[in-house]
């Protein structure tokens, strides 16, 4: 089990990845942190992500947060996707990090709000979705593909908040198939209250739909909570 963790205080701080293990899902043993913000590309935090397996090793994929200086001298945050390889105890960050940067996104996609990668393997390829928002402050999920987990290609905006009613940034997306139907789960920020729902601003919704694996299109139904 991996989780967001700031080991030094009970207040918000640069995120680490905590680590616990169990052989029965009931009794857990705390392990040393597996990721710490110790590189230039993630010095402001190792945000959440997901994991897969390659060649018998764990592969953690996470969002590294850093700052960049703009041409006018101002400082702006950047969120990029990074990987680390491990054996269940010790994890080493790839020298290729960050493996996905905001510069790989279309021009109208945010480089600041670009986080929480979910990875999976289909056939010989790996796929990854990341939460994002566009220049109109509407949430969306973007899709990338790779053959080796280190060189990635932008594919498409898989789903978006085209109506403007489903919040701004879409955090922590997940995408999977269940009984022939694909589901996209995400946590939109800044949702507007609707009757008895969405009164805390940050929520979780899911979309059911059909995914075309060749064209990378997702025909989604209306969101449900």
What kind of region is each of these model predictions?
Residues 1-116, 120-167, 177-225:
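Beta-rich carbohydrate-recognition and catalytic domains
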Residues 170:
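Short, well-structured alpha-helical interface segments that form or flank functional binding sites
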């Amino acid at each position: 089990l991996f989780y967001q963790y700031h080991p030094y205080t009970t207040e918000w701080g640069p995120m680490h990845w905590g680590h616990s293990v169990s052989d029965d899902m009931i009794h857990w043993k705390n392990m040393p942190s597996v990721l710490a913000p110790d590189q230039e590309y993630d010095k402001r935090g190792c945000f959440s992500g997901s994991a897969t397996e390659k060649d018998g090793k764990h592969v953690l994929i996470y969002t590294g947060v850093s700052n960049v200086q703009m041409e006018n001298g101002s400082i702006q945050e950047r969120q990029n996707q990074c990987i680390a390889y491990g054996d269940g105890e010790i994890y080493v960050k790839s020298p290729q990090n960050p493996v996905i940067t905001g510069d790989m996104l279309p021009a109208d996609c945010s480089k600041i709000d670009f986080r929480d990668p979910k990875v999976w393997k289909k056939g010989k390829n790996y796929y990854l979705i990341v939460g994002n928002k566009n220049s109109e402050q509407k949430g969306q999920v973007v899709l990338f593909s790779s053959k080796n987990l280190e060189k990635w290609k932008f594919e498409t905006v898989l789903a978006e908040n085209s109506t403007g009613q489903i919040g701004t940034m879409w955090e922590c997306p997940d995408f999977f198939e269940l009984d022939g139907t694909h589901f996209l789960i995400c946590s939109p920020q800044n949702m507007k209250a609707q009757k008895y729902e969405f009164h805390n601003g940050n929520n979780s919704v899911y979309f059911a739909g059909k995914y075309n694996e060749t064209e990378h299109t997702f025909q989604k139904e209306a969101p449900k909570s």
